[in-house]
Amino acid sequence: DHTRGLKFMKERLELSGMEVIAHPSCFDEKMFGEESIGAPYSAADMAGICRYRPCGGPCNISERLVFLGEIPDAVDFETRKAIGRTRIRGKWQDDYVRDDSALVYRGEEGIFIITGCSHSGICNIVQYAQAVCGQQRVLGIIGGFHLFEADERLVRTIDYLKCCGAEQIYPCHCVSLRAKARMMEVLNVKEVGVGMELCLDGQAAH
């Protein structure tokens, strides 16, 4: 669910004029055991398919939308875990998914964060989004949080999101039912479904 959809996107759409923004490591080779789990295309392939723009740091997609690039490790309880291995400059090493990133919508009243799988840690992402955008108010978060167990990390994550004042939480994939149930006890958790439409600053976001 990270990059394999690109193959089907290429089959259905003309991508030559489309700009694709991603972390520079996004298209590196990745293995989990004996299985290849990386993107179907290399960075060189992408440069020939579309207007590929590697971004290791924050970059503006539009006046309101920001791609965060690589997320720094700042929150002590969000320790990264390796998921398989990746080949960097010809050498295989543990993959800590440094290419995991997020988008931020900069609204008039605060920020709205759109995550992928949050391998970087949802609290790390929130803290970095606030710093990059210079806004503390978190209107909402939607996406995967990579939370499965009802453990200490979940408890501390819930406390963090409560303390930072996250107003609406839309947990999608990568969040277990048990984790969602615990979050609902404290946070304003919203149901997410296909076709859901959010309205930010009076503009519809599909």
Segment roles from a protein language model:
Residues 49-53, 64, 186-192:
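Active-site regions of enzymes building and remodeling cell-envelope glycoconjugates
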Residues 35-36, 57-108:
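Active-site-proximal loop/helix segment associated with metal-binding centers of metalloenzymes
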Residues 1-57, 71-79, 162-169:
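Active-site HxH/HxHxD metal-binding segment of metal-dependent hydrolases
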Residues 30, 62, 69, 75-78, ...:
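Short acidic/glycine-rich loop or secondary-structure boundary segments that cap or lie
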Residues 189-206:
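Short, basic/aromatic-enriched C-terminal tail that caps enzymatic domains
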Residues 30-33, 149-151, 199-204:
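Short, charged, surface-exposed secondary-structure boundary motifs
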Residues 2-11, 96-102, 106-113, 117-193:
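Cap/insert and terminal regions of metallo-dependent hydrolase folds
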